């Protein structure tokens, strides 16, 4: 008699994805972030659902409904801060997951990589709309500034912005539609995750060496399930330390002031995980140029498979590329810092140099170094 998990139509899919899946024996902790992102998405959907039960998407009551959740709802404060800080954990895992893909050449799986970039964009859109919902000062002005960027699109820009706003400014209509989209997008993300996994399981996982590992595979369960459980426990530990000890560490104090269209905060800035893109946007004096740079800073990831000129897939045995990769990481940290600083000397010039370096490394330096390393292999 064959095992039910191998014959039952539903169990069979789960079995092939999580139990009997052949996985490379040498994948490191960097391969844990996929499961951690799945956990983050589950936490966000679960906490978000409970927040939506008490939230009202009306400009008059949105701010007070969030206050009501924190003060009057049983463990409402916990749910709210788990959701807010869960987003930060989500982005930390996302950046590490993408960085892993860049370092070990996982982008050579075109479909998996491109679906991943679409997922990144979808999560960024969801997080942006979620930040607007508490209707604090930074929510309102962040929504105004970012949606206003679309007015840089020639000819249709202004009409497009007013269409998104549902009026002539960010108001009730905007808040209501942002709530609707913020609610539905995570489920679209969950569907895209399934497609992401579908394409991944067509080829199998990459591994640190970048070599084909078909001759050395082990079952996912128990080896990698137990490894994932360790990662999950650490993620929950870090999240709960953040939530219970310093829940507002990554937030903005301005968001504890109700939205006021007549008073602009001194420094309008998004959440920390958008600061690198915000710094790139601000480093270009022209509005349309800034918007194009902002969009390019994410979409450039889709060019990685085309810019891969090395004869080796992974950076594991390519020290020059490794150095360049870590310079890119440092550059992104610098951009994140600059994005949170006021627009004044010397921050503006540092931001401009860091933005140029970001695009130069990806488009010119990494491909050039790959060609040099190819030459070195022949000597």
Curated annotation (Swiss-Prot):
Membrane-crossing segments per the record: 33-53, 77-98, 113-133, 178-198, 226-246, 288-308, 320-340, 347-367
Q: Which domain of life is it from?
A: Eukaryota
UniProt GO MF annotations: metal ion binding; ubiquinol-cytochrome-c reductase activity
Q: What does this protein do?
A: Component of the ubiquinol-cytochrome c reductase complex (complex III or cytochrome b-c1 complex) that is part of the mitochondrial respiratory chain. The b-c1 complex mediates electron transfer from ubiquinol to cytochrome c. Contributes to the generation of a proton gradient across the mitochondrial membrane that is then used for ATP synthesis.
Gene3D superfamilies, sorted: Cytochrome Bc1 Complex, Chain C
Q: Which organism is it from?
A: Marmota marmota (Alpine marmot)
Q: Which family does it belong to?
A: Belongs to the cytochrome b family.
Give the GO biological process terms: mitochondrial electron transport, ubiquinol to cytochrome c
Q: Which keywords does this chain's UniProt record carry?
A: Electron transport, Heme, Iron, Membrane, Metal-binding, Mitochondrion, Mitochondrion inner membrane, Respiratory chain, Transmembrane, Transmembrane helix, Transport, Ubiquinone
UniProt binding sites for heme b b566: 97, 196
Could you give the cofactor binding note from the entry? Binds 2 heme b groups non-covalently.
Stated name of the protein = Cytochrome b
Cross-referenced PANTHER family, in alphabetical order?
A: CYTOCHROME B
